[in-house]
């Protein structure tokens, strides 16, 4: 079996019900603070540049007022499920793999992908996931994929379609008013949106050999306002972990750096999931309103999403 784990980016959302919502009148408190845990699915199938094999993570929601410990995290991943993937004509089983079972070298690689710092001896939860490690069913644009999950006496299903991709026409760095134009530039793009289909987009940014970073807000777009038009779109650079905030260079790209833009096309169900999740994360606070994260999964929470990615690598220059 050829393991492709180093190519995988496993994004883990702990759907712990972390919404302690307040309003001007009175705080919102759930009727039942000890609701039964619900299963959460987070899975993806990809096509295009650097496509990972189909994979998913199974977790459970946590009680509203629960305390989170290393034991809680380790016990939050669901192991032993039967997961099948189908494209309508072929069906395969996804293999289960847990972090604790990996050889030391692969643990280091997996930790990097998962965002854990091994050298600092930080706690790393025993993440278990299910994947098509042999690429027996690689994602293809235009195809629909169904998953079926059997676990804890429950049957969970979901369906997603990898869209026909719409590529960027061009990327261009331009001066930005008020900034040091010799050192930092703004990135703008041009997109010809087809009128015959509804399209949903997202972008991520990688600087040099670093990881892809998703902007904390505004990374998602649909074509409701520019369907069938030629459209110019600015792509601000998101700040990296630990990067200090500087208002004069916020969103700008340092001249001379190699930059990769990951342009993602997705179906509506994945767009709705990410859009409501992103809105919820960015609107927490004492005067925020409750946002229900949308799901396309039947029998559980979460998402099963199909996407197509195109990478554009350019050097920042005028």
Regions found by a protein language model. Name each.
Residues 20-23:
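C-terminal motif of bacterial Sec signal peptides marking the signal peptidase cleavage site
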């Amino acid at each position: 079996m050829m393991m492709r784990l180093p190519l995988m980016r496993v994004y883990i959302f702990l759907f712990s019900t972390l919404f302690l919502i307040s309003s001007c009148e009175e705080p919102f408190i759930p009727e039942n603070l000890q609701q039964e845990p619900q299963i959460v699915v987070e899975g993806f199938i990809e096509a295009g540049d650097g496509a990972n094999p189909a994979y998913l993570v199974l977790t459970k929601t946590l009680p509203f007022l629960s305390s989170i410990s290393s034991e809680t995290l380790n016990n939050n991943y669901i192991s032993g499920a039967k997961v099948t993937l189908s494209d309508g004509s072929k069906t395969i089983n996804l293999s289960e793999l847990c972090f604790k079972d990996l050889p030391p070298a692969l643990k280091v690689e997996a930790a990097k992908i998962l965002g854990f710092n091994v050298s600092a001896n930080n706690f790393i939860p025993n993440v278990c996931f299910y994947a098509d490690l042999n690429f027996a069913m690689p994602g293809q644009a235009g195809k629909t994929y169904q998953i079926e999950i059997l676990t804890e006496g429950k049957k969970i299903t979901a369906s997603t379609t990898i869209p026909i991709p719409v590529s960027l026409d061009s990327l261009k760095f331009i001066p930005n008013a008020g900034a040091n134009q010799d050192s930092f530039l703004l990135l703008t793009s041009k997109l010809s949106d087809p009128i015959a289909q509804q399209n949903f987009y997202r972008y991520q940014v990688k600087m040099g050999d670093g990881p892809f970073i998703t902007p904390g807000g505004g990374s998602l777009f649909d074509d409701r306002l520019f369907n069938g038009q030629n459209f110019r779109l600015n792509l601000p650079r998101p700040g990296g972990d630990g990067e200090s905030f500087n208002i004069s260079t916020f969103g700008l790209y340092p001249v001379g750096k190699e930059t990769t833009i990951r342009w993602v096309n997705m179906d509506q169900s994945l767009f709705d999931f990410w859009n409501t999740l992103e809105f919820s994360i960015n609107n927490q606070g004492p005067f925020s309103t409750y946002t229900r994260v949308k799901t396309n999964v039947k029998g559980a929470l979460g998402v099963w999403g199909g996407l197509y990615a195109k990478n554009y690598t350019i050097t920042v220059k005028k």
